[in-house]
């Protein structure tokens, strides 16, 4: 068993060996290395054909038409293109956008930029379970609302939004619906023929594909228009200029094909491992799951261990590669804004750890993790005066602390 054990699949996944093997055929002189836009020779034709195959593989994953897939550098770019692209194109119709407080920074910061440009954004509060209540969503919709941007699966707490119901609501109100599916594409079944999603962001490295590649699904019927954010040679039907990275696109396509074929068996395994991990630690006193436990992606377990300081817990768990928030904000010592939005205290948010399980996690690794967690929590609490006070029956919420 290799240490540290990787329990951070929500931050990134290793490239599946089958994907890496396929990508190797599209880089060197003895492979297919041509520019897919070169129409005058075989090198270009072969590369273009490889891109077409991959485009169909990504489309098949969500049951879309291959012409609805636009390749990007990843979900961050897809989110930017979707949100800014819609806002700029439809601004004469209205300048109001709805999103939630628990979105990824790639959505929140894009919305903040649009606010600086004169758009109005409503940031919805989730319920205590991390899910946006439908009535709260409907109440925020106005005549000048042009876009709703909402994640399918939350990257920190793994809760799943009902995009079928939300899509129906948006369609009935004439509001464009963008879904950030970075954490769900390739993990949960998605069918855009049934679900009324207009735009969907997809990430390669979250589903065992390479980093630096993603896609944006753009619905053709009813047609969704975007204003391009990247100008140049007019690639990707004018929506995203830039030479297509054949090897990465092939990697994304292969990862999508594998995800579609293995989704059911992968999820059954991951679900069993998640339950094994939770059953091994749930009896530790003052241990709580953050986010809805039922309406949740099975590979995510976000747990707060009360009366344990987050950073010391991370150090105690040095043999486990885990995180205390999203990878994009893990350098910050601030408590997770997602957990704060759920109403957790700073202390509880600070004592939370996200365990994310994936395709290559084993039972042996989960059992090893349980042992380390049980031992570490006990040791850290022995050193905590707060734990001692709590055990003595002191109500810590009523204690007045003196600042020196």
Swiss-Prot record:
The active site is at residue 328. This is Cysteine desulfurase IscS. Pyridoxal 5'-phosphate binds at residues 75-76, 155, 183, 203-205, 243. PROSITE patterns: AA_TRANSFER_CLASS_5. It is an enzyme of class 2 (transferase). Pathway: Cofactor biosynthesis; iron-sulfur cluster biosynthesis. One of its GO terms (cellular component) is L-cysteine desulfurase complex. Master enzyme that delivers sulfur to a number of partners involved in Fe-S cluster assembly, tRNA modification or cofactor biosynthesis. Catalyzes the removal of elemental sulfur atoms from cysteine to produce alanine. Functions as a sulfur delivery protein for Fe-S cluster synthesis onto IscU, an Fe-S scaffold assembly protein, as well as other S acceptor proteins. The modification N6-(pyridoxal phosphate)lysine is found at residue 206. Its main location: cytoplasm. It is found in: Cytoplasm. It comes from the Bacteria. Belongs to the class-V pyridoxal-phosphate-dependent aminotransferase family. NifS/IscS subfamily. GO terms for biological process: [2Fe-2S] cluster assembly. Its EC number is 2.8.1.7. Keywords: 2Fe-2S, Cytoplasm, Iron, Iron-sulfur, Metal-binding, Pyridoxal phosphate, Transferase. Homodimer. Forms a heterotetramer with IscU, interacts with other sulfur acceptors.
